[in-house]
Amino acid sequence: MNNTLYRKKLSGTTLDYYDTRAAIEDIQAGAYATLPYTSRILAEQLVRRCNPDDLTASLEQIIHRRQDLDFPWYPARVVCHDILGQTALVDLAGLRDAISEQGGDPAKVNPIVPTQLIIDHSLAVEHGGFDSDAFDKNRAIEDRRNEDRFHFINWCQDAFDNIDVIPAGNGIMHQINLEKMSPVIQARDGIAFPDTCVGTDSHTPHVDALGVIALGVGGLEAETVMLGRPSMMRLPDIIGVRLVGKRQPGITATDIVLAITEFLREQKVVSSYLEFYGEGAASLTIGDRATISNMTPEFGASAGMFYIDEQTIDYLKLTGREPEQVALVEQYAKETGLWADSLTEAKYERVLTFDLSSVCRNMAGPSNPHRRLPTSDLATRGIAKEWTETNGEMPDGAVIIAAITSCTNTSNPRNVVAAGLVARKANELGLIRKPWVKSSFAPGSKVAELYLKDSGLLPELEQLGFGIVGFACTTCNGMSGALDPKIQQEIIDRDLYSTAVLSGNRNFDGRIHPHAKQAFLASPPLVVAYAIAGTMRFDIEQDALGVDSDGNPITLKDIWPTDEEIDAIVNASVKPEQFKSIYEPMFNVKVEMGEQIKPLYDWREMSTYIRRPPYWEGG
């Protein structure tokens, strides 16, 4: 239920909006100008939805930055992956049973808040990127293993109102949220308001890059929001992170985020909301910003926000959002003080400064994402050292998994294109992947396949063993699949120190694969380079990856692309029509169940995956 006070016409549109500035100024003149971006969005939803009797007290909490009282938060959407999202929907299906048994209408049990469920957590890379049929084989295995789950989820798509289901094989929840699902500014029932969401995954803040508050929550809290109840919260510490300087040539967004992760962990920003701003932030594309926002949980924070600005507008156009929606985002942000230029007087609990020009080529590891490892320090850190490669045997420190994976990096076209260019130069020079390396490429969006084909880089990646194995989380969430049995046995018999290199966001011991004793996070182009090197004992900046036809050593600098090369391909090959061609049909998919959908689920008594919740018995 929306309030009536402070509701006004949004100029240049047929929509209304809530004048949060006026509501704040009525309590304390001049206060709105000092509010951070996050506070302005939290205040808006209070003006729009809060009980009028509680509105003044709730807004005073935000104005005076009181953190000792709860206030209601009404997210606009719920986004779920298939693991926790499925659990929430099982609860709702059980509730339908209980209501039916009491003589009620089970069809009335539906999410009130729009809910989007994306199946992305269940695909394992059983077949690596060197298998030309890997995608089809991995998907077939996924469907076979998850038939019970997918049957239930498909029923939910048709049985419940207000739920969109994106079937398996279409991408990662966070990347689809960034590229399609978030409108940035909602327009419902004649009212424009900021998009916000909760998601059943810790990396839900990925879409903070668009200026959308998106928090990772557990399944129970997601259920609460689905059913229209507010999520009660206290005002967090809101910390400004001023980005200054300009990144050095050859530095990727991955290098930047790994350096920022180390920096912010040292600054102790646990549970804080971060707002990145300054000339450095303004220079970053949304792809770069998303790489940073995605690793918010690795910072220890709850949100990693960027302001709405021209980069936001450019990205919405690039990803095929409708012109009317793009215009609404700009108009609303400028009218309500959410545009970057309107936040120059914002006051924060703390302001931290990070210089982008200080970033060098980085990895993270072993074992922790905040354990930054400059590639220039591999020898001094004891990672790179003397090693020998005996014919027919794996070396010490063998890289057994090299995975271009995760929405952290595959939602950033510059990172993906850089990997393709490294592959192309490596192929031209005759370099090959080491045979013990299980390589894979799992983009978080089908759009990546289109622009890589358009640029001619997908065949280059495939030649090195980085063919597309799926559009899902895969190796990043531990679904790296089985190793070749001979390789696995050699690791066991020789007690080898074996490793994984991936473009993901977490590398805790044992997470990536039981036989990868440690794992390292790296940019997609570095992942390709390590597949060629084949061991972490290799000094990636200094050692020779191979020799050319004249016998000259080939090092990383010989295959690393320039920024100009990367940008030229991104500008020529990433197009709005690609996003439209992927997403327009995706959101119209209905899975044929072969029968008329009933309001009650027909529980499978022998299922070990999906069972009727026992706590509704006698409810």
Task: List each model region and its residues.
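Fe-S-dependent hydro-lyases/dehydratases of central metabolism
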Residues: 1-619
